[in-house]
Amino acid sequence: MAHSIWHEKIKSFLPEHYYGRINHFLDEAYTSGLVYPPRENVFKALQVTPLEETKVLILGQDPYHGPKQAQGLSFSVPEEISAPPSLINILKELADDIGPRDHHDLSTWASQGVLLLNACLTVPAGQANGHAGLIWEPFTDAVIKVLNEKDSPVVFILWGAYARKKKAFITNPKHHIIESPHPSPLSSYRGFFGSKPFSRTNAILEKEGMTGVDWLK
């Protein structure tokens, strides 16, 4: 399901048998309709970014709900898929902050310790937030609580009001929070553009004696 160390730590913040409830939910959802991402990618964020390597969290709300977009990493799409509006704005801010990046697939960020997590890990086709409030929030809140327990610093990048509510779980003074409005077209000009989250993250990591992220890779 997820990287084994993640699995053991997350379980400690969940009611007993919660993983069984998740599996039942997934069985029902994927047999009753079209759901994104593909089932094998539901836990991809936790599979490709081990807990011990995680130094940044970028929290999204739920997967893209269009065909072939969602791949289990927040804001990322496969390389051959056109960038959705929020990702276009993320890449625009990155270009203004550090430099241009042409890739739509953010897997190389994930492989450098950037956990690309959505608060909801599944979505029905064409129905944004269609699985909100059903099963995922206790699980992904537990992920944030696990990160909060880390001894090494983590930079939490929280875009938009929904993500910023999760600050309540970040109580460890070792960690850092970068927050701004969401990169969606509705809010990007209200403070997302010009917020420089990428250079600010690297400045924090380097000050903490850690390696910065190659955001252009």
Curated annotation (Swiss-Prot):
Keywords: Cytoplasm, DNA damage, DNA repair, Hydrolase
Cellular component terms per the entry's GO annotation: cytoplasm
E.C. numbers: 3.2.2.27
GO molecular function terms noted in the UniProt entry: uracil DNA N-glycosylase activity
SUPFAM superfamilies in the record: Uracil-DNA glycosylase-like
InterPro entries: UDG_fam1, Ura-DNA_Glyclase_AS, Uracil-DNA_glycosylase-like, Uracil-DNA_glycosylase-like_sf
Stored PROSITE patterns: U_DNA_GLYCOSYLASE
Keyword Zinc tagged: no
Name of one Pfam family that matches: UDG
Enzyme class: hydrolase
Ranges in a coiled coil: none
Gene Ontology annotations of biological process type: base-excision repair, AP site formation via deaminated base removal
Localisation: Cytoplasm
Active site: D62
The UniProt record lists the keyword Cytoplasm: yes
Enzymatic reactions: Hydrolyzes single-stranded DNA or mismatched double-stranded DNA and polynucleotides, releasing free uracil
Family stated for the protein in its record: Belongs to the uracil-DNA glycosylase (UDG) superfamily. UNG family.
Function (record text): Excises uracil residues from the DNA which can arise as a result of misincorporation of dUMP residues by DNA polymerase or due to deamination of cytosine.
HAMAP family for this protein: UDG
Name of this protein: Uracil-DNA glycosylase
Lineage: Bacteria, Bacillati, Bacillota, Bacilli, Lactobacillales
